[in-house]
A protein has these predicted regions:
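Oxidoreductase cofactor-interface core, primarily capturing Rossmann-like NAD(P)-dependent enzymes
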Residues: 2-15, 24-25, 46-47, 59, ...
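Glycine-rich, histidine-containing beta strand-loop boundary motifs that form or position
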Residues: 41, 68, 109
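ADP-ribose/adenylate-binding Rossmann-like module
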Residues: 55-71
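Structural signal for hydrophobic/aromatic residues that build the beta-strand cores
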Residues: 1-2, 37, 52, 64, ...
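N-terminal Rossmann-like NAD(P) cofactor-binding module of classical short-chain dehydrogenase/reductase
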Residues: 31-40, 65
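Beta-loop-alpha module in the N-terminal Rossmann-like domain of NAD(P)-dependent dehydrogenases
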Residues: 44-52
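Conserved acidic residues
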Residues: 19-21
Length: 118
């Protein structure tokens, strides 16, 4: 698990936790030797994935899975209903731009999440 240096969350025993700055140079160092990244950045940090993507490219990471665990955020009608998905579209477009670097990516559209709806 890659998390910010300031994060005080206690993780389960056996989980490798790397606490670091989310600045590009710090991320490049900790991402070296990794094959893939699965981003679980929350809504307030979607745009910060660009720094993570750039660091992954510099570190030679082969695959990036963005924080895209929802419906098809490339759909205009979905983004009209859920405006918070607009930054997710921007990240997918950014990944498309970066394909020429050799970084591959997968966006996971799992459908709407209703567990939190009461």
């Amino acid at each position: 698990v890659l998390t910010r240096s300031s994060n005080t969350t206690t993780f389960p025993a056996g989980v490798t936790v790397i606490r670091t700055s989310y600045e590009k140079f710090a991320l490049e160092k900790v991402l070296e030797g990794q094959d893939a990244i699965i981003s679980a950045i929350g809504a307030s940090g979607f745009q910060e994935q660009k720094v993570l993507i750039d660091a992954a490219i510099k570190a030679g990471v082969k695959r990036f899975i963005p924080s895209e665990f929802s419906t098809n955020t490339l759909s205009e009608s979905v983004r009209q209903l859920v405006p918070v998905f607009e930054p997710k579209k921007a990240i997918l477009e950014y990944l498309m731009e970066k394909e020429s670097t050799g970084l591959t990516w997968t966006g996971l559209s799992i459908g709407a999440m209703f567990d939190w709806v009461s």
